[in-house]
UniProtKB/Swiss-Prot annotation:
Recorded family membership: Belongs to the bacterial ribosomal protein bS6 family.
Compositionally biased residues, Basic and acidic residues: 109-118
Pfam family, one: Ribosomal_S6
Region (Disordered): 97-241
Composition bias type Basic residues, residue spans: 97-108
Signal peptide: none
GO cellular component terms listed in the entry, alphabetical order: ribonucleoprotein complex; ribosome
One of the GO BP terms on file: translation
Keywords per UniProt: Ribonucleoprotein, Ribosomal protein, RNA-binding, rRNA-binding
This protein's name: Small ribosomal subunit protein bS6
Gene Ontology molecular-function annotations: rRNA binding; structural constituent of ribosome
Gene that encodes the chain: rpsF
Biased composition, class Low complexity, residue ranges: 130-151, 161-182
Amino acid composition bias (Polar residues), ranges on this chain: 189-202
Length: 241
């Protein structure tokens, strides 16, 4: 039959009879012979808003099914806050003390050469930590300010480049408009000159045609004598048959 060691933590206001009756009910009357109360009363962390409790330790031989029954009853008992069951056949119990050689042996773990040393004898005070945190916050704030300033300068430079590009485009557009206007004016002037020249040519042709018609028109005035008439007719060009 395996041997167990059971440690229980009880409410500081509870009586020892609670754990005594529970052990007798589950394991029998002889199970409480080695039950004892430990001197330790402090808790590592508060339980139900209390920092102290009662510690009880007992060694007994019991089958597995009775251990399970003890666990079930301990879970429903309000005065029992915590419990720990150790199988002494496979693990070391809480009641065994280490040997003097092992207890006085000092073991210093090997520290990596890249690891920072931990000086526990000279812990940093709360004010030093606050100063370091304030310095770190100030450095972060300055870094953020520099980043924002650099970003603002970059945006300003980009905006200036865009403005210069827009101004250049506007100037090119105005120059193109002027060139087109000058080209149209030159074409209009040239067209007007051509029209005027054509009109003059047409007038000259019309005047020449009229002069030719008057020159070659037969004279029907009876006052001309026959000789002048013959001279005129001789000057008139002959039509080709």
């Amino acid at each position: 039959m395996p041997k167990y060691e059971i440690m229980t933590i009880l409410d500081p206001k509870a009586e020892m009879a609670i754990i005594d009756n529970l052990l007798k009910t589950v394991f029998g009357d002889n199970s409480t012979e080695k039950l004892r109360k430990l001197e330790t009363t402090n808790l590592a962390y508060p339980i139900r808003k209390s920092k102290i409790a009662q510690y009880f330790l007992v060694d007994l031989n019991a089958p597995t099914n009775l251990i399970e029954e003890f666990v079930r009853r301990a879970n429903i008992t309000r005065e029992i806050w915590r419990y720990l069951i150790v199988n002494l056949d496979s693990e070391k119990g809480l009641n065994k003390k280490p040997k003097i050689r092992e207890r006085n042996r000092k073991y210093t773990p090997r520290r990596d050469r890249f690891e920072k040393p931990n000086f526990r004898g000279n812990p940093k005070s709360r004010f030093d930590q606050q100063d370091q945190q304030a310095t770190k916050n100030q450095q972060n704030f300055q870094q953020n300010q520099q980043n924002q300033t650099s970003q603002y300068r970059e945006n300003s430079r980009q905006n200036q480049d865009d403005f210069q590009q827009v101004s250049s485009n506007q100037q090119n557009f105005g120059q193109n408009q002027q060139n087109q206007s000058g080209y149209h004016r030159e074409n209009n002037r040239q067209n007007q000159e051509n029209i005027h020249q054509n009109s003059k040519n047409h007038q000259n042709q019309t005047s020449q045609t009229q002069r030719n018609r008057r020159q070659y028109q037969p004279i029907k005035n009876p006052k001309f004598n026959q000789k002048e008439k013959e001279n005129y007719n001789n000057k008139k060009p002959q039509s080709s048959n």
